[in-house]
Amino acid sequence: MDGVVIKNTGSQYLVRCTDGTELYCMAKGNLRLKGIRSTNPVTVGDRVEIVPASQDGQPAYIKRIHPRRNYIIRRASNLSKESHILGANLDAAVLVCTINDPVTTTVFIDRFLATAEAYRVPVILVFNKIDCYTQEDRLQLDRLSAVYTAIGYPCCHVSAITGEGLPDLKSLLDGKLTLLAGHSGVGKSSLINALIPHADLRTGAISQAHHTGMHTTTFSQMIDFPDLSPGSALIDTPGIKGFGTLEMGEYEVSHYFPEIFAASKGCRFGNCTHTHEPGCAVLEALRRGEIAESRYISYLSILEDENAERYRPEY
């Protein structure tokens, strides 16, 4: 029997079967996809083959994961070689950002975008809490949005409290399975409650000591839109503190920054790292202001990760 994983509680997975029934299943201990060392071998959005519970008391279990069309993955922790898969078989991903309380840095945004580029997942940047922004915050919002829209990433300015911008965002999600990600405290749960009122997700407050969010979502789950086209759904995920990248070779990183990749076609050397080489078209574009400095800094940060990974000993 086949189905789609719609919830991951850590020990069990809720699977919606092709006949519409929903079953909690265990994952077999040897269930792994080739070439992926993951803390969660099964993720929400996975298409799976399951074996129903038997009459002798054996619980239902996931027998096989069907090949994934794509997925979003991050390093499980800074010192880990294992990964954590946020969601699979996605039509889009929404990264929820805030200018303040908490601050979403451009490095965090760019690491998420680069990973999504690597796995061919289109991203929409959603800047939430615009009802709370000062004039200075709004100027910063406009500057950031200009950088990302110029590259090709749609940017939505919304308020989960007032509803501003939500109709436009909702239209972008119609007919899509969309992953929702971001730091704790950016208002993901409030945003889902505003978009899908029946979701009734718990929301949390901001830690005033650290200006970071406190986790309210503790597991990933798929939530259907009742008023959009069939197949329209969000995958809600727990808040992420950092975004460590994986599986990017030193000479591949630039491929996942569209504007850097476009400029790199003019480089003198095919193995240019765009850091110091003579005849580097990327550095020239950076000097001319055609590549945002913040984006180049993010590129360097991922490049440093990959160089450090090469010299990390096996344990």
Curated annotation (Swiss-Prot):
Pfam families: RsgA_GTPase, RsgA_N. GO terms for cellular component: cytoplasm. GO terms for biological process: ribosomal small subunit biogenesis. Its EC number is 3.6.1.-. HAMAP family: GTPase_RsgA. PANTHER family: SMALL RIBOSOMAL SUBUNIT BIOGENESIS GTPASE RSGA, SMALL RIBOSOMAL SUBUNIT BIOGENESIS GTPASE RSGA 1, MITOCHONDRIAL-RELATED. This is Small ribosomal subunit biogenesis GTPase RsgA. It comes from Porphyromonas gingivalis (strain ATCC BAA-308 / W83).
